[in-house]
């Protein structure tokens, strides 16, 4: 889990409601704390609910990361109107290239967003740090291994009839 890497342990325990009072103090002692030492840990439901909540949490996390990647890539390509575009049967000519002549420093934008935007977050902190160190993100694969959690979340949404286009 990322809790080890981030020092943000946020257990999402499930199980017998009768057992929770006996283990609550242990879970809350090791969990992250916010606002006056309030633990980031609560019992989330019966047996299996903790895994289910964590699965959906990770699906949301993947959606957020994808949104950052897509948005920052749009900013990164905002200078395409300056460059001579390729024209072929496979690539349509750009309409209105004059609208895409911005040379945007995505590392600076990510830093700005992480300091005061509604989308500021730990994930954006990591993104801004990575862009500052390596603005072109050279050497990165641009993909992550499939742990299955994203697919499980989408399958659960389909199974229970909840539209989840962002997570899909």
Label each PLM-derived region with a short phrase:
Residues 1-22, 27:
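Rossmann-fold NAD(P)-binding glycine/threonine-rich loop
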Residues 8, 12-13, 22, 35-168:
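Helical "substrate-binding/catalytic lid" subdomain
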């Amino acid at each position: 889990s990322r809790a080890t890497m981030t020092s943000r342990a946020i257990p999402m325990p499930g199980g017998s409601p009768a057992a929770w009072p006996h283990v609550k103090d242990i879970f809350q002692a090791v969990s992250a704390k916010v606002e006056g030492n309030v633990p980031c840990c609560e019992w989330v439901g019966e047996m299996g609910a903790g895994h289910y909540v964590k699965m959906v949490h990770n699906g949301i996390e993947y959606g957020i990361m994808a949104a950052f990647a897509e948005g920052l890539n749009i900013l990164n390509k905002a200078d395409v109107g300056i460059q001579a575009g390729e024209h072929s049967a496979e690539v349509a000519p750009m309409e209105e290239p004059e609208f895409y002549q911005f040379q945007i420093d995505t590392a600076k934008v990510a830093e700005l967003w992480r300091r005061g935007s509604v989308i500021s977050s730990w994930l954006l902190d990591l993104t801004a740090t990575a862009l500052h160190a390596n603005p072109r993100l050279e050497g990165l694969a641009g993909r992550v291994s499939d742990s299955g959690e994203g697919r499980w979340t989408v399958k659960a949404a389909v199974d229970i009839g909840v539209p989840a286009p962002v997570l899909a």
